[in-house]
From Swiss-Prot:
Protein name: Delta-conotoxin TxVIA
Note: Veratridine increases the rate of dissociation in a dose-dependent manner.
Swiss-Prot/TrEMBL domain comment: The presence of a 'disulfide through disulfide knot' structurally defines this protein as a knottin.
Xref: InterPro entries: Conotoxin (IPR004214), Conotoxin_d-typ_CS (IPR012322)
Pfam families the UniProt entry points to: Conotoxin
Annotated signal peptide: 1-22
Function of the molecule: Delta-conotoxins bind to site 6 of voltage-gated sodium channels (Nav) and inhibit the inactivation process. Binding of this toxin is strongly calcium-dependent but not voltage-dependent. The binding site is most likely on the extracellular side of the sodium channel. Binds receptor sites on both mollusk and rat central nervous system, but despite its high affinity binding to rat sodium channel, it has no functional effect in vivo and in vitro on it. Also has no effect on Gambusia fish. Is important in mollusk for the paralysis of the prey.
């Protein structure tokens, strides 16, 4: 039991050490958090608002369900 606990603690420590000392030239976590903060302040900057969707009566994709307001039925947005 003690050995198992020691192994778990060692793995967690090494994982944390790897993430803390990783060389990321793009500042991955810093960019991630600053972009998320920017999107909270400016909802127009969110990538979700820029999705392409089809209006009612246009041809649509059954798999993606890419209609803006309704559903894709028989390849036409309703």
């Amino acid at each position: 039991m003690k050995l198992t606990c020691m192994m778990i603690v060692a793995v967690l420590f090494l994982t944390a050490w790897t993430f803390a000392t990783a060389d990321d030239p793009r500042n991955g976590l810093g960019n991630l958090f600053s972009n998320a903060h920017h999107e909270m302040k400016n909802p127009e900057a969110s990538k979700l608002n820029k999705r392409w969707c089809k209006q009612s009566g246009e041809m649509c994709n059954l798999l993606d369900q890419n209609c803006c307001d309704g559903y894709c039925i028989v390849l036409v947005c309703t």
